[in-house]
Amino acid sequence: MTLAKVFSQKLRELGISSIYIGHERPSLQSLAIKMLLKNYGLVEERREGMLITQDHGIKLISGKGTETSRYTFRKGGKKVSIHLPEYPKMVIDLGLFEFLNEEEKEKTLLQVDLCLSVIRKFLWDGNLTVVGKADYVLGRANIVQSLSLSDEDNPVILDPYGDVVATDQILRDHNVFVIGGIVDKGRRLDRATERLALSRGYSFPRVKIQLRGSIIGVPDEINKILEIILRVKELDQSLEEAIISLQSKSDKISRLLHDVQLYGMEVLEEEARWLRADDKVIEIVRSRLGKN
């Protein structure tokens, strides 16, 4: 359950159906994050404004208008006590970080940094854990040296060479997702997640995310893997839709090249529509195949 949904349920319990938000971003998720991490909350005062949006049944009002609210969201306001979602827990394990060269370390930490903004789209910092780098600071995410999990956590580790193929249901049924702080596909340290799992003694399932039977075209950035999982679990998107939505142009090109080489040029247009690839991507694919 997203933080926005938890927040909206608590507001309704308190009899609050609308909030005047001033210049704040019109999103309950954004308001809840700001309330948790900064000195913001609700002040009981009557304000009039224009209905900007209705988010999870709560009216968000701003500017001038005829809509009324008894509560204003602002700095110094009273915080609303909400039950923070314990699951899902997203874990990034940096156990192989010291084996990376400097360029790889820089890219890895950039992707991990981006995970904070991703987790805040759905949950909050407390649902993110970084393992194996004691001097690392990432908002209010949990920074630990080793991971302690129970059977109730029902964990899996994401590995492009794992023996379990991810499905929508598998992702929705599990509570904890471990992502290795390194990219496996075609990089210097091949099958690094398998190596990480062995070194850590992780005995739980190694799950691979595929797109119609292949890992080609599946984004491999840590932050995007995390968001794919959260879109399936928290927004009820299909796994395929989440993958395609987060593909870069490079991901689309790689998949189109793979499929055209496998099935022939006649599939290019249909595959491009499936991947929502634009004309520029199709042009690049044709050029690389010498078909211009």
Curated annotation (Swiss-Prot):
InterPro entries xref list: MT_TRM10-typ, MT_TRM10-typ_sf, TRM10_methyltransferase, tRNA_m1G_mtfrase_arc
- Chief subcellular location equals cytoplasm
Enzyme class, UniProt record, top EC level: transferase
Q: What is this protein called?
A: tRNA (adenine(9)-N1)-methyltransferase
Source organism, top-level taxon: Archaea
Task: Tell me the GO molecular function terms.
Answer: tRNA (adenine(9)-N1)-methyltransferase activity
Q: Which GO terms describe its cellular component?
A: cytoplasm
Q: Which UniProt keywords apply?
A: Cytoplasm, Methyltransferase, S-adenosyl-L-methionine, Transferase, tRNA processing
Check the record and name the Gene3D superfamilies matching this protein: 3.40.1280.30
Function according to Swiss-Prot or TrEMBL = Catalyzes the S-adenosyl-L-methionine-dependent formation of N(1)-methyladenine at position 9 (m1A9) in tRNA.
Q: Which residues form the SAM-dependent MTase TRM10-type domain?
A: 72-253
In the Enzyme Commission scheme, what number(s) does this protein have? 2.1.1.218
Q: Does the keyword rRNA processing apply?
A: no
**Catalyses which reaction?**
adenosine(9) in tRNA + S-adenosyl-L-methionine = N(1)-methyladenosine(9) in tRNA + S-adenosyl-L-homocysteine + H(+)
- Organism listed in the record: Sulfolobus acidocaldarius (strain ATCC 33909 / DSM 639 / JCM 8929 / NBRC 15157 / NCIMB 11770)
* GO BP: tRNA methylation; tRNA processing
Family stated for the protein in its record: Belongs to the class IV-like SAM-binding methyltransferase superfamily. TRM10 family.
- Where does this polypeptide localize? Cytoplasm
Matching PROSITE patterns: SAM_MT_TRM10
